[in-house]
Amino acid sequence: MKVWDLHCDTLYELRRAEKAGAPKSFLHNDLHIDLEKLRQGDYLLQCFAAYVDLADPAPGADPLVSVLEEIDIFKRLMAAYPEKIAPVYTAADLERNRAEGKFSAMLTVEEGGCCKGSLGVLRRLQELGVRMMTLTWNYPNELAAPNANPGGPLVANTETGLTEQGFAFLEEMEKLHITADVSHLSDKGFWDIVNHSTRPFAASHSNCRALSPHNRNLTDEMIRALAEKGGIAGLNYCASFVDADSAHPKLCRSTVERLAKHAAHFKQVGGIEVISLGSDFDGIGGQHELETAADMPLLAEALRREGFTEDEVEAIYWRNAYRFFKNNL
């Protein structure tokens, strides 16, 4: 079963290893994702996020520099293993990579704050190959507010959403065919996107709030709106977003059976076409039954036990994401 994963933080971990003077091989390493694990998991495409923490305490830390360094790592990986993996910037790239038997890699950004409110920076990121971007991570920025807030993980931010510059970014992202990613965005920001977007958008790594009440997950109303706009949501393997006990993350566990329940809820509320995968590999800790990309057959088996047909499992694993990006790149 082919796999299309909408989100991982592997570039961040590779950059961190380089900064520590102990670079990791992309052929085989101790991370959740490397080329061997992608082979074992039968991957078609992995979205690689250039992620940055705006509160990075490192002296002289600059979010844009951090993102550019991660993009540089992405480019170097593509150049180092051209016979195994190749970037996807257009739908034609995907078809060519499939025909040549290569893994595909799509470049994304997690934290629109790296642009510092500059549309010029956004346009440059698109030229470098970025095809999806979250407006926020866990901190307010020039574009929007997140759901992370002092009230804790069970409290959603319904008061602040996109800024004036955030709306300008949304408009420009749609012109540039950079998919707007609403994962991490506040509830208010989500509805701002719904009400002002003209193209489908994604929640690259978010689950169902009805099953796990963390504010990073989507309410049923959000799932319906996302589906109506032609969007997709990637199942996130993070234990706090999978388990029902989101208020106690140290006690949470992510199992394939529980992930299958989230998939079933997505299907019931928004239909099968809204569901995709968004592992958050290399960005999550804790107890996870899916320990690496090599373990993906386990989730397919759980989905079948949950009652999904083979066609539906295939839709979740790659066909929905393939359709979405074929129409939106």
What are these regions (language model features)?
Residues 19-40, 298-300:
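Short catalytic helix/loop segments, enriched in acidic residues and glycine
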Residues 117-127, 149-202, 215-230, 257-273:
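Histidine/acidic residue-rich metal-binding segments in metalloenzymes
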Residues 7, 38, 90, 129, ...:
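Conserved, mostly hydrophobic/aromatic
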Residues 2-5, 45, 104-108, 131-132, ...:
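Structural preference for beta-strand elements that scaffold enzyme active sites
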Residues 236-237, 269-293:
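Short acidic/histidine-rich active-site segments
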Residues 30-32, 36-123, 138-175, 191:
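A metal-dependent hydrolase metal-coordination microenvironment
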Residues 291-329:
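Mid-to-C-terminal alpha-helical segments outside catalytic/metal-binding sites
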Residues 9-11, 51, 90, 110-112, ...:
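Active-site beta-loop-alpha junctions enriched in small/polar residues
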